[in-house]
């Protein structure tokens, strides 16, 4: 479980887990000891990592597992507008495949099975900083500064 929750590289992050980790491309805006601020499209996302070794403006990837994304109304965190591309019902859960921007891959969101989302509907996604990962241009993970128990 340690590799799943604390991948040291993009390779490990994408290899372990099904559905796989979502990766969103962005640029580093700010790096402090306890967090980094990343621009993804028109959104600024806070990530609980130490990225001080990276240069401002560096190309980075923000990683988030499908079960660590909430749909609007489910709590705080950064909001990203998306549109539902496909819904896969699995019984007790559903997978929402959403598009968060023309330059981003389809993002997978795991929700409970009672989701009533409709194709093409607009959804606001909540990304909580403590569940996000940050990978540099070489695919190496930045050290997380807020560790949740696993």
Tell me what each language-model feature is.
Residues 1-5, 13-16:
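Short acidic-hydrophobic catalytic motif
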Residues 19-150:
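Non-catalytic connector elements of ABC transporters
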């Amino acid at each position: 479980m340690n590799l799943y929750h604390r991948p040291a590289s993009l390779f490990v992050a994408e290899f372990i887990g099904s559905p796989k980790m979502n990766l969103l491309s962005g640029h580093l805006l700010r790096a402090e000891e306890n967090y980094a601020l990343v621009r993804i499209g028109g959104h600024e996302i806070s990530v609980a990592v130490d990225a001080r070794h990276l240069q401002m403006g560096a190309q980075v990837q923000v990683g988030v597992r499908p079960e660590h994304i909430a749909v609007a109304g489910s709590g705080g965190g950064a909001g990203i507008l998306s549109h539902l591309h496909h819904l896969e019902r699995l019984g007790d859960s559903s997978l929402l495949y959403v598009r968060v921007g023309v330059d981003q891959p389809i993002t997978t969101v795991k929700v409970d099975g009672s989701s009533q989302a409709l194709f093409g509907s607009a959804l606001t996604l909540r990304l909580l900083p403590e569940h996000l990962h940050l990978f540099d241009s070489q695919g190496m993970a930045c050290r997380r500064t807020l560790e949740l128990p696993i």
